[in-house]
């Protein structure tokens, strides 16, 4: 590999925001926040919304998605158009 053209690939701790589960892996992502890991070293901490610990596919649990707001937004945007076509 050529020197100085690849991003810095280093150990990083990712934390699930919902469950608090943490795992250590390698990434090019960086963060100002750090956390002490089990091996006694400090690693950058990156908090993510969803991991395999909280994703419905991996947990088998269903989550209800808030679609009411999306439906209202759609009706506000396109509802008048549908009413005009219906009145013709």
From Swiss-Prot:
<dbReference type="GO" id="GO:1990904">
    <property type="term" value="C:ribonucleoprotein complex"/>
</dbReference>
<protein>
    <recommendedName>
        <fullName>Large ribosomal subunit protein bL31B</fullName>
    </recommendedName>
</protein>
<dbReference type="InterPro" id="IPR027493">
    <property type="entry name" value="Ribosomal_bL31_B"/>
</dbReference>
<comment type="similarity">
    <text>Belongs to the bacterial ribosomal protein bL31 family. Type B subfamily.</text>
</comment>
<comment type="subunit">
    <text>Part of the 50S ribosomal subunit.</text>
</comment>
<keyword id="KW-0687">Ribonucleoprotein</keyword>
<dbReference type="GO" id="GO:0006412">
    <property type="term" value="P:translation"/>
</dbReference>
<dbReference type="InterPro" id="IPR042105">
    <property type="entry name" value="Ribosomal_bL31_sf"/>
</dbReference>
<dbReference type="Pfam" id="PF01197">
    <property type="entry name" value="Ribosomal_L31"/>
</dbReference>
<keyword id="KW-0689">Ribosomal protein</keyword>
<dbReference type="InterPro" id="IPR034704">
    <property type="entry name" value="Ribosomal_bL28/bL31-like_sf"/>
</dbReference>
<dbReference type="GO" id="GO:0005840">
    <property type="term" value="C:ribosome"/>
</dbReference>
<dbReference type="GO" id="GO:0003735">
    <property type="term" value="F:structural constituent of ribosome"/>
</dbReference>
<dbReference type="InterPro" id="IPR002150">
    <property type="entry name" value="Ribosomal_bL31"/>
</dbReference>
């Amino acid at each position: 590999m050529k020197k100085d053209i690849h991003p810095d690939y280093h150990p990083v701790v990712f934390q699930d925001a919902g469950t608090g589960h943490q795992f250590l892996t390698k990434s090019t992502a960086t963060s100002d926040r750090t956390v002490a890991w089990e091996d006694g070293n400090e690693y950058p901490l990156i908090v993510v919304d969803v991991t395999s610990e909280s994703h419905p596919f991996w947990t088998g649990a269903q989550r209800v998605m808030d679609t009411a707001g999306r439906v209202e937004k759609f009706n506000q945007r396109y509802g008048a158009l549908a009413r005009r076509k219906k009145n013709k």
